[in-house]
Curated annotation (Swiss-Prot):
Residues 1-102 form a transit peptide. It comes from Arabidopsis thaliana (Mouse-ear cress). One of its GO terms (molecular function) is dihydrolipoyllysine-residue acetyltransferase activity. Its cofactor is (R)-lipoate. This is Dihydrolipoyllysine-residue acetyltransferase component 2 of pyruvate dehydrogenase complex, mitochondrial.
Length: 539
């Protein structure tokens, strides 16, 4: 079977590599037991592939065959910090694949169904932002097919094999496309393009079709009910009372009751299983109950003013932000620690450094750059806060990667400054400006925001917010909220002496499963020390 597939396309270079690497495992990749064999041999794919994708050979003869191939995403590399056995299995089990189909229909030549790829660990669906190729265009490995809007950013999706784009299944602007859902068809021969003009993608639920055949049992039940409807009505009347939360009524009965402002709960059904029918509503109205229920509702309706509103559709980033933050507040036991830090010395050091920067033609250093550096060094000093909770253990990270919250017109992004504890202030500033610009242009790639271990959110400088509590960015265990600096009158050295100093409020949100209160306080003490003695950050 393996040789038959390889002979079909000379461009399956990765299959040849797998055969040379481990013939036995590669053969299993072409069988129906593909996934079990992959679980134990992830090292093969880590060594050979710089992307993760699953290609399924559909309907080759009478069986289905599965293999690894590629939709290059230029982003989800298995060598990244996010990659590991668990993440790899998630990609393998996902439906991100391209499908080479040997159709059972003689009208369809061999083709490839390209599915919506999973471009980030949290991605479950995506949108087609823009098609860069048209139907009929020739495609080559490395060429960009389309731009996919993920839960984090807009990512270019590249083609892995040479051929022709025969059919665009999901048009430009299509939204909420599930991972694995077919978005396009490619063929090897240009003459085959026209054969896919009216093509409908194959269903992934095909194997479940035979299981749905027990449907004929439904008509049997209906036939039994109809002749016994009269006696059953008397028996089932009492049973309608307990199910107060759900009232069974015919559509016509519901409409009639609604038009006359009659609550269905006040009507006793005489139909099968206590079902309320039209005659029951008419009998209720005829009994004189109509007036007592209709008049109050008319008075209420007359006093309710009409609301003027507009419905704004959710963007992909908005839906993901809502989902992740709701998950965070529902599952992470937050607690908050606030401290005031004197920033006079930090502002003085910043002025000196900016003088050097201007003289050398460099960019100015911001307060946020100093805050990121101080947070990174404090994490190195108190590594318990640079951790993540799992059900089996607490994972403490050796890298200090700081996510920085950036608000854009499209939504909230959190790009990451990696190894911030090892970088200088000017380097941190350059990276933050570069990532913020990419976020505003909606051009962040997965490697720009994945792998963070701690988050900093600053609403003080840009918006003048004095103090706030931020929501933890899962799976991290803490987030630092930066408020604005303000001048305060503080006691001087003498009994009647007073000085003016600038103070900034910072609040640390902690996951109590990971960080105990004393540990969080220890981290804030270290952070405050770096802010109030900024020269120590340069050591």
């Amino acid at each position: 079977m393996a040789s038959r597939i390889i002979n079909h396309s000379k461009k399956l270079k990765h299959v040849s590599a797998l055969l040379r690497r481990d013939h036995a495992v590669a053969v299993r990749c072409f069988s129906n037991s593909t996934h079990p064999s992959l679980v134990g041999r992830e090292d093969i794919f880590k060594a050979r592939l710089n992307y993760s994708s699953v290609e399924r050979i559909s309907k080759c003869g009478t069986g289905n065959v599965t293999m690894l191939s590629g939709i290059s995403t230029t982003s989800t590399k298995l060598s990244s910090p996010m990659a590991g056995p668990k993440l790899f299995k998630e990609f393998i089990s996902s439906q991100m694949r391209s499908v080479r189909g040997f159709s059972s229909s003689s009208d369809l030549p061999p083709h490839q169904e390209i599915g919506m790829p999973s471009l980030s660990p949290t991605m479950t669906e995506g949108n087609i932002a823009r098609w860069l190729k048209k139907e009929g265009d020739k495609v080559a490995p490395g060429e960009v097919l389309c731009e996919v809007e993920t839960d984090k950013a807009t990512v270019e999706m590249e083609c892995m094999e040479e051929g022709f784009l025969a059919k665009i299944v999901k048009e430009e602007g299509a939204k909420e496309i599930q991972v694995g859902e077919v978005i396009a068809i490619t063929v090897e021969d240009e003459d085959d393009i026209q054969k896919f003009k009216d093509y409908t993608p194959s269903s992934d639920t095909g194997p479940a079709a035979p299981e749905a055949k027990p449907a004929p049992s439904l008509p049997k039940e209906e036939k039994v009910e109809k002749p016994a409807s009269a006696p059953e009505a008397k028996i089932s009347k009492p049973s309608s009372a307990p199910s107060e939360d759900r009232i069974f009524a015919s559509p016509l009965a519901r409409k009639l009751a609604e038009d006359n402002n009659v609550p269905l709960s006040s009507i006793k059904g005489t139909g099968p299983e206590g079902r309320i029918v039209k005659a029951d509503v008419e009998d209720f109205l005829a009994s004189g109950s109509k007036e007592t229920t209709a008049k109050p509702s008319k008075q209420v309706d007359s006093k309710v003013p009409a609301l003027d509103y507009v419905d704004i559709p959710h963007t992909q980033i908005r839906k993901v932000t809502a989902s992740r933050l709701a998950f965070s507040k529902q599952t992470i036991p937050h607690y908050y620690l606030t401290v005031d830090t004197c920033v006079d010395k930090m502002m003085g050091l910043r002025s000196q450094l900016n003088s050097f920067q201007e003289a050398s033609g460099g960019k100015r250093i911001s307060v946020n750059d100093l805050v990121i550096k101080a947070a990174a060094l404090a994490l190195r000093k108190v590594p318990q806060c640079n951790s993540s909770w799992t059900d089996e253990y607490i994972r403490q990270f050796k890298n200090v990667n700081i996510n920085v919250a950036v608000q854009t017109e499209n939504g909230l992004y959190v790009p990451v400054v990696k190894d911030a504890d090892k970088k200088g202030l000017s380097t941190i500033g350059e990276e933050v400006r570069f990532l913020a610009q990419k976020a505003k242009e909606n051009s962040l790639k997965p490697e720009d925001y994945e792998g963070g271990t701690f988050t900093v959110s600053n609403l003080g400088g840009p918006f003048g917010i004095k103090q706030f509590c931020a929501v933890i960015n899962p799976p991290q265990a803490a987030i630092l909220a930066i408020g604005s600096a303000e001048k305060r009158v503080v006691p001087g050295t003498g009994p009647d002496q007073y000085n003016v100093a600038s103070y900034m409020s910072v609040t640390l949100s902690c996951d109590h499963r990971v960080i105990d209160g004393a540990i969080g306080a220890e981290w804030l003490k270290a952070f405050k020390g770096y802010i109030e003695t900024p020269e120590s950050m340069l050591l």
